[in-house]
Amino acid sequence: MKNLLRALISQGIEALRANGTLPADSLPPDFVVERPKTRDHGDFATNAAMLLAKAARSNPRALAQALVEALPRSEDVSKVEIAGPGFINFHLAPAAYQREAASVIKEAHDYGRNLSGNGRTVGVEYVSANPTGPLHVGHGRAAAIGDCVARVLDANGWNAKREFYYNDAGVQIENLALSTQARIKGIAPDQDGWPEGGYRGEYIADVARAYMAGASVDLEGSTVVGAKDPDDMQAIRRFAVAYLRNEQNLDLAAFGVDFDIYFLESSLYADGKVAEAVAKLQASGHTYEEGGALWLRSTDFGDDKDRVMRKSDGTFTYFVPDVAYHLSKWQRGYERAITELGADHHGSLARVRAGLQAMEVGIPQGWPEYVLHQMVTVMRGGEEVKLSKRAGSYFTLRDLIEEAGRDATRWFLIARKPDSQLTFDIDLARQQSNDNPVFYVQYAHARVCSLLRQAQEKGLVYEQGNGLANLGRLADDASLLLMNEISRYPEVVEAAGVALEPHLVAQYLRELAHAFHTWYHGTPVLVEDAADRNAKLTLACAARQVLANGLELLGVSAPEKM
């Protein structure tokens, strides 16, 4: 409906150009059509007249009046008013909302989706945990946000490629191998001989036992087998990484998260991508030698200081493979690249972008885009939950899913804006009450399914065609409020895609569920009059469809019974 009003306003502006009220060469304004905070101000409002007033050399209210008079007439608009300094408020006719409810039924799963992305490819990287231990709840938040961002982008017509970057090179992998070897030799974390910086969780003992048992790990088309040799560090390292990568993959699968691409940091070295990135930076003239190290003059590109690329001992800093990895994304044809990270990685953003700009290979400024998430605090019984026996020092994603369930875990981890800190209340997530938002939304969906079952049990045949034909009967306030809420869904999908904020979908679904429950409690649905009954069931089915569509974007199930 917003697009309908934009079209009417644009036609009105053209009419003002044609009659000389506006200069013929004036640029069309980037005006806003939005829903006012209160419905007393109409269903939609625009600032178009205020933006055009200067070009027209007119008072904004006077120009608003002229624009209102120039608007084409539409049966979907019942009233147009001028408010404040020159806002134009639109009141929609009930028929507009009734047609929108009918559109939901006809478009079904496609309702709310748009083609703004035009099928262009966007790479979405998320989780990207080191393969050194179980996924913690912070990784879980990254997984939920990243997966939902990709789903929302798909709904906005993008071709989202989901990517996991494994940091399988460096000191942390060596510490993993040393920790596993120590466990193989019977050394516990509190005993002499335990490696400095070793991983202390009980899961390391699991890795060690599997290695010595000759267990096999199937991972992306290849098999890694435990060599049973306690002194073969290369074999231990390879097995430990494969074992823990597989464990992480199992947790992500249980969480409903999958990836198109698993990219290994080690491949950047093996395939010459790190060397290529360094060569491009040197060729561009933005590097210099100092103190035996190779530096990037990243301050030329907005960084707060120059960055070391190659240390005096010949090894590269983490910055270099990060730049090489993002260069590979560009070379793979990603028109957009979005990286979901913990907020503690904020310091790396400017340097990676500076490195990409310094290559001078056509990568645009602001590429890649970043979504940063804050920490998660897990509460149970009013107290913070910190430890996991399996991980040793943190509460794992697997622990959380086992306690709260997949749906509640996904919902709660994306329910707030990514850059805000999140408190996950396990007790609330397990409640089957209206206080639990995921239960409240899912129950609205299940309630419609129950209505249809009740109708069938009573021998009342639901005729959808008859219901669509009689939606015009539903002009009471509660029905129109529900239709109004339903009609917001396409706008929410678009807004979530632009802002990369899937929590907007969760917030909307709570509001839609509230509108539905309010309508349900105040509206007898299974009435004797067939036309009324079919119309009400059709409206209920429209609400159910939008609830299902929105829950799908969040990766949360839409149950038929609860």
UniProtKB/Swiss-Prot annotation:
Provide the top EC class: ligase
Q: Per the record's keyword annotation, is Protein biosynthesis included, yes or no?
A: yes
MF terms in GO: arginine-tRNA ligase activity; ATP binding
Cellular component, GO annotation:
cytoplasm
Subcellular localization, as worded in the UniProt entry: Cytoplasm
What keywords appear on the UniProt entry?
A: Aminoacyl-tRNA synthetase, ATP-binding, Cytoplasm, Ligase, Nucleotide-binding, Protein biosynthesis
Which EC numbers does the record give?
6.1.1.19
Give me the reactions it catalyses.
tRNA(Arg) + L-arginine + ATP = L-arginyl-tRNA(Arg) + AMP + diphosphate
Question: What InterPro entries does the entry give?
Answer: aa-tRNA-synth_I_CS, Arg-tRNA-ligase, Arg-tRNA-synth_N, Arg-tRNA-synth_N_sf, ArgRS_core, DALR_anticod-bd, Rossmann-like_a/b/a_fold, tRNAsynth_Ia_anticodon-bd
Query: Where would you say this protein principally sits, based on its record?
Result: cytoplasm
Q: Name the residue ranges of motif: 'HIGH' region.
A: 129-139
Q: Which Gene3D superfamilies match?
A: Arginyl tRNA synthetase N-terminal domain, HUPs, Isoleucyl-tRNA Synthetase, Domain 1
Biological process, per Gene Ontology: arginyl-tRNA aminoacylation
Record's subunit section: Monomer.
Annotated family: Belongs to the class-I aminoacyl-tRNA synthetase family.
Q: Any idea what this protein is called?
A: Arginine--tRNA ligase
Could you tell me which species this protein originates from? Stenotrophomonas maltophilia (strain K279a)
Provide the taxonomic classification. Bacteria, Pseudomonadati, Pseudomonadota, Gammaproteobacteria, Lysobacterales
